[in-house]
Regions:
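Cofactor-pocket helix-loop regions in the catalytic cores of large enzyme subunits
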Residues: 35-274
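Extended active-site and interfacial segments that coordinate phosphate-rich ligands
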Residues: 2-36, 149-150
């Protein structure tokens, strides 16, 4: 195999084959790749055809107590196929209780009415992003790419004001002069998105949680009178408010999220905390 051409899908991955951005086909050409079903007979591997292999497998597991153990490393389709094969009662996700609780919480959030969960294409249209406790460059690289695109929206907006088309990359870059839509990253380690972030902070899971609640409180305060919203950075220049660094950061994040046309908060389960 020398080349793969993917059909364009504007609603899902566009030209990407994998939503995690990790598709590869190099293994297809490996000399040691299994291409033939084998059966071990008298300590020797004997080649068998696929129909015989399937029939023999069914015959051997029929009327026996079989369990299926899935894996978060396997694809959704593979886990689903295994679950169908062994039955709901005989299937394990391969997760421990804490990990399963996290997955259940994610499912609950995704299925809750009133909570907007944008697709990867939608993420690109947001103009302010807060990432809390999730290194998406490692857990969902396609989402990370969408965040990179979202960071360019301020430049596109500035270019549009001068009637410059967004696809003119160099003119848009010159007009923006480095301006980007605000992206805040709060994580337990530095991430590969730091280069596009307005602020990137390394903190403990406990402090990340505290900051998240403080941002929510500040947004609630701003919502009391949107007409009086003032950039916290401007206030800090005029007077020493005496507030701690976390509170000041929470105010700045809340301000940028409220001022944005389409703010977005991204989180995940990699810190194993609900």
């Amino acid at each position: 195999m020398r080349r793969i051409e993917n059909r364009y899908n504007g609603e899902v991955n566009r030209y990407f084959l994998c939503d995690r951005g990790r598709f590869g086909y190099g293994y297809v050409n490996r000399e040691d790749r299994p291409t033939q079903a084998l059966e071990r007979i008298n300590d020797k591997h004997v080649k068998i055809n696929i129909n015989y292999a399937l029939d023999e497998t069914i015959k051997r597991i029929k009327d026996k107590k079989i369990i299926g153990i899935g894996s978060p490393r396997a694809s959704l389709e593979t886990n689903f196929a295994l679950k169908n094969l062994v039955g709901f009662e005989n299937f394990s996700t391969g997760l421990n209780h804490q990990q399963q609780a996290l997955v259940n919480k994610c499912i609950e959030v995704l299925s809750t009415e009133g909570i907007y969960n944008p697709g990867m294409t939608d993420i690109e249209s947001h103009d302010a992003v807060l990432i809390l406790g999730e290194d998406i460059t490692q857990t969902s690289s396609r989402v990370a790419l969408s965040i990179r695109q979202a960071a360019k929206n301020e430049a596109i907006k500035m270019a549009a004001a001068t009637k410059t088309q967004s696809w003119l990359a160099e003119p848009v870059k010159r007009i923006a002069q480095g301006s980007q839509s605000p992206v805040y990253i709060i994580d337990v380690t530095q991430t590969k998105l730091e280069d596009i972030s307005k602020v990137s902070v390394v903190a403990t899971p406990e402090d990340i949680t505290k900051l998240g609640f403080k941002v929510a409180d500040e947004i609630a305060k701003f919502a009391d009178d949107l007409a009086k919203i003032v950039d916290p950075q401007t206030v800090e220049k005029d007077a020493d408010t005496g507030m701690d660094a976390m509170q000041a950061l929470a105010q700045q994040i809340a301000y940028d999220l409220i001022q944005a046309n389409k703010p977005l908060v991204v989180s995940g389960s990699s810190l194993s905390s609900i």
